[in-house]
Amino acid sequence: MEFLVEKIGMSRTISVPSTPVTLLKVKDAKVCEVLGNGKALVAYAQGKDANKAIEGQQKKYNLSKEFNRFATLEVANGEAGDQDVAPLAQAVRVKVSLQTKGRGFTGVMKRWNFAGGPAAHGHRFKRRTGSIGNREWPGRVQPGKKMAGQYGNEKVTVQNEIVSFDAENKILVLKGSIPGFNGAFGRIKVVK
């Protein structure tokens, strides 16, 4: 079973020793159409964007204006209606997929953990990349060479244990951290 979630932030349990936890809000979603093999077309609310294509889908599936986004998910529902969140109550582990924090154009020390050069005694190397290849052979930069560039803002999937699930408020508490900023949007999949 898959669910759409929004990251609330991190906290910790009151027990001794305390456990670091991440809070996720399970988004309200409506199953529009069951597609077979356990998958379904699901509508959810995000922002206020709307165009004629979205309005046509809202009319077709008799949805209110707030449900303006669509996704294909594995669901427990056998028919159209509100998405069933009951499987989360019995779940033990989930796979969480979110975008990591974007860090922009970053140097090799931050992006790839390069050691850098000496900072004193007249050195100019400091945080620079240094040599990126040999001389006549191979006469080019090898593919996959670690260099400065865009860091972060990529999809990452991790597995976490479920600590608790508040079905009334749809808040899922996971052990440990997950990628992404507070308010990040992603999806979870029940593993077992």
Swiss-Prot record:
Sorted UniProt keywords: Ribonucleoprotein, Ribosomal protein, RNA-binding, rRNA-binding
Gene Ontology BP annotations: translation
Molecular function, one GO term: structural constituent of ribosome
Similarity-based family: Belongs to the universal ribosomal protein uL3 family.
Primary role: One of the primary rRNA binding proteins, it binds directly near the 3'-end of the 23S rRNA, where it nucleates assembly of the 50S subunit.
Quaternary state and interactors: Part of the 50S ribosomal subunit. Forms a cluster with proteins L14 and L19.
PANTHER family tied to this protein: 50S RIBOSOMAL PROTEIN L3, LARGE RIBOSOMAL SUBUNIT PROTEIN UL3C
This protein's name: Large ribosomal subunit protein uL3
Source species: Wolinella succinogenes (strain ATCC 29543 / DSM 1740 / CCUG 13145 / JCM 31913 / LMG 7466 / NCTC 11488 / FDC 602W) (Vibrio succinogenes)
Gene: rplC
